[in-house]
């Protein structure tokens, strides 16, 4: 009897595998909008891919992957073969994820509302989509080696560079929303408390940035060497100071009342992270000490004969993963009315659509059990670009690939090495990020005939 009830329970979920997103989540989650629930499911699927990629880097798993016929054939380089298998596995897994999201991005071009037949593919058919993704990933493991790893390294580097810039755009949006929320609460009541909170958050960000700069000069520079690191730290410090001063100039405040030091402090600490991440990719080990050596621990990891070592975990990579998760989930739930950011991310003003959706009672709600319902708030128009959202996840897959492999490149000499290319990609992205932030400050002054509200 129990088995029959169990089968009936499982059977009740079968329509959900081919139906809309709310059917999957609304049985265990509160009521919500279809647009938000769908994005969360895609983000959770990407998170599962990240977890699998992390598992593939575990030495025990690498030994199992090494049993795949021909996967690590004729690899007799300096770096152990099982390490190469781990990095290759991440490349192929992320290749499959990236191709899955790129395919959806191309399929969803110019979808205007949920009444478009392609919107049903975006918001439903989950079983078939996930099965397709798994099939693409499995197929990626049978791609002949050849130049695949080298070519995909450069593709991943370009995609990761673009995703870093998207991270910065979302970070600017988050900082603006954060500042606006606290300023509104400060004006409504208990102004001293909220003013102190705003000031404390700003001061903490700048304090952490200052501590980071001091540590960079202490551990990543030497009096007679490491001139590149000295230049990176100094230039980024001056750029952050300039952007912070610019954000509180009277002319900027007049045209951009929402600008302030809180946003600048968030951009500053993110720039310091990019600077640190870039310096940790330098090939010269004397200018790139490991975190364990900095804090005084002696490592006992095996080192090959030529001294080329491979570390399985990287602190800057862990921080990068945390930022990645925050970015993806924030982009999945954000309902910001910041018009500048919405234009950059091809997002509509969601508030009006939500209000319209909440006002409907006939056919607008996906009935669930009890009060668990989801609003189809995209019948009159999508609240975000389906195509751009999938393209962002495509770039996120490449960013994860580069982060988990620490931006290492597989050399023809069969060594896993850091590259100056990765250093310059990260440093240039930090510079472009500051330029983008400064542009959000000065754009209303330069383009006076345009509305930036």
UniProtKB/Swiss-Prot annotation:
The modification Phosphoserine is found at residues 351, 361, 364. The chain crosses the membrane at residues 40-60, 89-109, 124-144, 152-172, 198-218, 232-252, 260-280, 310-330, 388-408, 427-447. Induction: Up-regulated by kainate treatment in neuronal cell layers of the hippocampus. Signal peptide: none annotated. It comes from the Eukaryota. It is found in: Endoplasmic reticulum membrane. Residues 2-39, 110-123, 173-197, 253-259, 331-387, 448-453 are cytoplasmic. One of its GO terms (molecular function) is acetyltransferase activator activity. It is a multi-pass membrane protein. InterPro entries: TDE1/TMS. Enhances the incorporation of serine into phosphatidylserine and sphingolipids. Belongs to the TDE1 family. This is Serine incorporator 1.
């Amino acid at each position: 009897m129990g088995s029959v009830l169990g089968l009936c329970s499982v059977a009740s979920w079968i329509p959900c595998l081919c139906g809309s997103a709310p059917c999957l989540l609304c049985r265990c989650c509160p009521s919500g909008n279809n647009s938000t629930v769908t994005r969360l499911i895609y983000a959770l699927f990407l998170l599962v891919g990240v977890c699998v990629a992390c598992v593939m880097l575990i030495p025990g798993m690498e030994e199992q992957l090494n049993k795949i016929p021909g996967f690590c054939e004729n690899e007799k380089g300096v770096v152990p073969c099982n390490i190469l298998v781990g990095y290759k596995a991440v490349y192929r897994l992320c290749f499959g994820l990236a191709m899955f999201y790129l395919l959806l991005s191309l399929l969803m071009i110019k979808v205007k509302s949920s009444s478009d037949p392609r919107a049903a593919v975006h918001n439903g058919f989950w079983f078939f989509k996930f099965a397709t993704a798994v099939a693409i990933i499995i197929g990626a493991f049978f791609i002949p080696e050849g130049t695949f790893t080298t070519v995909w390294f450069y593709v991943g580097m370009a995609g990761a560079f673009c995703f870093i810039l998207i991270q910065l755009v979302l970070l600017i949006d988050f900082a603006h929303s954060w500042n606006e929320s606290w300023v509104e609460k400060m004006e409504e009541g208990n102004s001293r408390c909220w003013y102190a909170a705003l000031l404390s958050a700003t001061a903490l960000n700048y304090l952490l940035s200052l501590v980071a700069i001091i540590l960079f000069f202490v551990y990543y520079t030497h009096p007679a060497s490491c001139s590149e690191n000295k230049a990176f730290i100094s230039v980024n410090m001056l750029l952050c100071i300039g952007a912070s001063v610019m954000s509180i100039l009277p002319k900027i405040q007049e045209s951009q009342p929402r600008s302030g030091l809180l946003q600048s402090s968030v951009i500053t600490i993110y720039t310091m992270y990019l600077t640190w991440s870039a310096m940790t990719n330098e090939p010269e080990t004397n200018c790139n000490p490991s975190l364990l050596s900095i804090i005084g621990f002696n490592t006992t990891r095996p080192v090959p004969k030529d001294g080329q070592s491979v570390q399985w975990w990287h602190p800057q990579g862990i921080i990068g993963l945390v930022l990645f998760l925050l970015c993806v989930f924030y982009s999945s739930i954000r309902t910001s009315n910041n018009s500048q950011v919405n234009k950059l991310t091809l997002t509509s003003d969601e508030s009006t659509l939500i209000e319209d959706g909440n006002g409907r009672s006939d056919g607008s709600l996906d009935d669930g059990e009890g009060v668990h319902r989801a609003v189809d708030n995209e019948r009159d128009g999508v609240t975000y670009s389906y195509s751009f959202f999938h393209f962002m996840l495509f770039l996120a897959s490449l960013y994860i690939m580069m982060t988990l492999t620490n931006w290492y490149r597989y050399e023809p000499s069969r060594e896993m090495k850091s590259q100056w290319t990765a250093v310059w990609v990260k440093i240039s992205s930090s510079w472009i990020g500051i330029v983008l932030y400064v542009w959000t400050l000065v754009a209303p002054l330069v383009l006076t005939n345009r509305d930036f509200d």
